[in-house]
């Protein structure tokens, strides 16, 4: 096996550690790396109190971009809650505007942006403990919480007038350039 592996999901790292496929990091490595990462970030590589990994990067996702000039021209107020956001989307559709541009095409990785939406919605609709139980496999995808959130995302995406998809459909539109 390799000396170093990159795990895109902390849950897979935890599973591999618990199954005995990983060795703990040396204390000096953990100490050195922890000087540059928060306890929360270090927690992604910590399994049951033992440090098996460290972050190698972070991604900033889950942002909603908007055009301030269009908001001003239409008299829209920037929402601060999810309920306000959905109320605004209804107003935008009634005004003939399309609230979202969404694309999930990403070659063999198509669909990861859907999971980002689901993760965001899980965190907004349920507790952090529920989210953690889901990401560690304790809460199955078939649970009411997870399946309900997935359905909510699909309902948003399938609302007539809600989504602009440059490629003709959300699945065939690249996540990279849908807003162009």
PLM feature segments, named:
Residues 47, 52-56, 62, 86-142, ...:
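Extracytoplasmic/periplasmic solute-binding protein
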Residues 1, 19, 70-71, 87-95, ...:
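Short helices/loops that flank or line small-molecule/ion binding pockets
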Residues 89, 135-171:
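Glycine-centered hinge/linker elements that transmit conformational signals in sensory
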Residues 10-11, 82-86, 166-180:
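Short helix-initiation/N-cap motifs at beta->coil->alpha
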Residues 9-12, 21, 41, 67, ...:
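Stable alpha-helical elements in mature extracytoplasmic
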Residues 69-79:
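Aromatic-glycine-rich donor-binding/catalytic loop that engages nucleotide-sugar donors
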Residues 8-62, 86, 113:
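Hinge/lid segment of periplasmic solute-binding proteins
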Residues 2-7, 101:
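Periplasmic-binding protein-like
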């Amino acid at each position: 096996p390799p000396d170093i592996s990159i795990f895109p999901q902390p849950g897979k790292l935890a599973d591999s550690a618990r199954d005995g496929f990983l060795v703990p990091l040396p204390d000096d490595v953990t100490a050195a790396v922890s000087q540059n990462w928060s306890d929360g970030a270090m927690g992604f590589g910590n399994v049951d109190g033992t440090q098996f990994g460290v972050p190698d990067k972070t991604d900033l996702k889950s942002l909603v971009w908007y055009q301030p000039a269009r908001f001003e021209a239409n008299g829209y107020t920037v929402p601060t809650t999810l309920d306000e956001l959905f109320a605004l989307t209804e107003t935008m559709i009634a005004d003939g505007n399309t609230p979202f541009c969404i694309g999930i095409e990403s070659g063999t990785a198509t669909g990861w942006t859907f999971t980002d939406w689901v993760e965001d919605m899980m965190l907004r609709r349920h507790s952090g403990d529920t989210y953690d139980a889901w990401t560690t496999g304790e809460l199955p995808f078939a649970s009411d919480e997870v399946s309900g959130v997935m359905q909510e995302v699909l309902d948003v995406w399938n609302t007539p007038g809600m989504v602009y998809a440059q490629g003709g459909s959300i699945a065939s539109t690249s996540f990279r350039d849908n807003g162009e």
